[in-house]
Design a protein with these regions (language model features):
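N-terminal loops that bind phosphate or other acidic moieties
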Residues: 1-192
Length: 192
C-alpha cells in the first residue's frame, strides 16, 4: 500500500508500503517477495490475489532499469495521459503486469478479487491487469509513446513493440466493488 497507509500489523499477513503513483525500490522488493512465494506452485495450488487501484505503482518488477521506469512514469504523469494510456505503456515494461503475474503462478489456479477504480471496470487496466489477459496492443502502446513524445531507451522501445498475454486459462476473476457501485451508494445516501 502507499506510504502511511499501514495502520498496524495483521497477524500472518506481511504488509509493504511503497511508492505511488511512481514505483520505487520498495515496490520492486515487495513484488520480488510475491514472486518468490508463487515459485514452484503446482496445478493443485490456488493463489488468492486481492487487487485494487494503485497496484500499477505498488506491484512492479520492471523489465527496464528501475530509474528508467520511474522516468517514463513521470513523463506519462506530466503529459496528461489518461489511466488507460498509462497502463498500456506500463504493461509492456513490466514482468508482472498485463497477465504476466498469472503466468508466474501457473500451473496454479489464480482466484483474483478486484476492487475497480476505473470507470467501466476494464479488468486489464485495473492495476495494469497482472492476472488477466491484456486487451491492449503493441500498436496502441507505440501510438501512445508517439502521441506524448516519450523519451525511451532502445530497450523500452523494443518492449513496447512486443505483445502481452492475450489468453490465460488459470485465472478466475471477480469484481467485488467498482466506481459505479460507489456512485450508486453515494446517490442512495444523498436521497436519504
Amino acid at each position: 500500500t502507499k506510504y502511511g497507509h499501514v495502520k498496524g500489523e495483521i497477524p500472518g499477513i506481511d504488509c509493504y508500503e511503497a511508492g505511488h503513483p511512481v514505483p520505487d525500490a520498495n515496490s520492486f522488493a515487495a513484488t520480488e517477495k510475491a514472486l518468490t512465494l508463487v515459485q514452484g506452485l503446482t496445478a493443485e495450488d490456488t493463489v488468492l490475489f486481492l487487487l485494487s487501484g494503485g497496484g500499477s505503482a505498488l506491484f512492479e518488477k520492471p523489465l527496464v532499469p528501475g530509474g528508467e521506469l520511474q522516468d517514463i512514469t513521470n513523463q506519462l504523469l506530466a503529459s496528461g495521459a489518461d489511466i488507460v494510456e498509462m497502463n498500456t505503456i506500463r504493461k509492456r515494461l513490466s514482468a508482472v503486469k498485463g497477465g504476466r503475474f498469472a503466468q508466474h503462478c501457473a500451473p496454479a489456479r489464480v482466484f483474483s478479487i478486484v476492487l475497480s477504480d476505473i470507470l467501466g471496470d476494464p479488468l486489464d487496466m485495473i492495476a495494469s491487469g497482472p492476472a488477466v489477459p491484456d486487451c491492449s496492443t503493441c500498436a496502441q502502446a507505440l501510438a501512445i509513446a508517439e502521441k506524448y513524445q516519450l523519451r525511451l531507451s532502445a530497450q523500452a522501445g523494443a518492449l513496447l513493440a512486443q505483445e502481452t498475454p492475450k489468453a490465460l486459462d488459470n485465472v478466475t476473476t471477480h469484481i467485488t466493488g467498482s466506481v459505479r457501485e460507489l456512485c450508486a451508494a453515494a446517490a442512495e445516501a444523498c436521497r436519504k
